Amino acid sequence: MMLDPARSYDLIGDVHGCAHTLEHLLDRLGYQKQGGTWRHPTRMAVFLGDIIDRGPRIREALHIVHDMAEAGQALCIMGNHEFNALGWTTPAPPGSGKQFVREHNPRHARLIHETLTQFEHHPADWHDFLGWFYDMPLFVDAGRFRVVHACWDDGFIAPLRATFPDGCIDQHFLQAAAVPGSFACNAFDRLLRGTDMRLPDGLTLTGGDGLTRSFFRTKFWEDDPKTYGDIVFQPDALPEPVARTPLSSTEKNSLLRYGVDEPLLFVGHYWRSGKPAPIRPNLACLDYSAVLYGKLVAYRLDQETQLDPRKFVWVDVERPEVIS
């Protein structure tokens, strides 16, 4: 689906199975449920991916978003969790050394566990949703604004657009991602997971999610960073000595920079906290950790060319996740 740049949109961050909270947010945004589908007379919702995994009502959340998309009331782009689900269920190509595009190891199993459990008695539904995931574009460029789950990188988006003008990939491209270092693998990693940098001196960091990593997520918009601490962009802080470590010239040159003069860009993915606000006048992250009892956040986009802090709308996720 092409987005009409003259229309008004509500961009919505990572849902992760928080269906009741999503309904609460849609209600707050002025959408009404008509004929079983949430609708707005003049606006359209744009979801930034990661509808599935982790939360208590994954199937319900998918039905809400899918029904809106089918009715022309919403567009949903692909998040890394939808990509993971396709990879989990898709055989790897011969010669790749893998059984599935996404290997069935304990770490990957843990991430998709809630989704598979909640669909255990609804296999036809799961099959249909997996097919729908292929209709989710990896990116959307509406001219005056752009959406991608984690990171806008023209170095990947330009060749992708040449092959997939609507941003929607096919199974062949998904299977190509089974090969580490391939264009497909790197494109998914960059657009759906963002940029990262290896920790120095062989260090590892165990995050709040319990996973141990040898790298950290980085900003892709800093103009003149000096230290690791200037570029870290994740919930888990770097140890102070690491944060103070100067960036080498090679590391600085490797950083991606989304320019301040580029179109408005909306991303999810990054588990932010606090009061929703722009990162820069042309950049907003709308993932505020809803599934960790944070906020489910939207931005109400009209015709502005710079982001307005007053146009963030959100619902605090209550314990347990309820609608009122």
What residue ranges belong to the model's regions?
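Acidic, His/Gly-rich catalytic cores of divalent-metal-dependent hydrolytic chemistry
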Residues: 166-324
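A short acidic-Thr-Gly-centered motif at the start of a beta-strand
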Residues: 1-5, 37-38, 63-70, 137-141, ...
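Active-site environment of divalent metal-dependent phosphoester hydrolases
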Residues: 18-19, 53-55, 82-86, 154-155, ...
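Active-site neighborhood of divalent metal-dependent phosphoester bond hydrolases
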Residues: 55-62, 67-197
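Residue-level marker for buried hydrophobic side chains located in beta-strands
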Residues: 11, 45-47, 76-77, 146, ...
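N-terminal active-site segment of His-dependent metallophosphoesterases
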Residues: 1-64
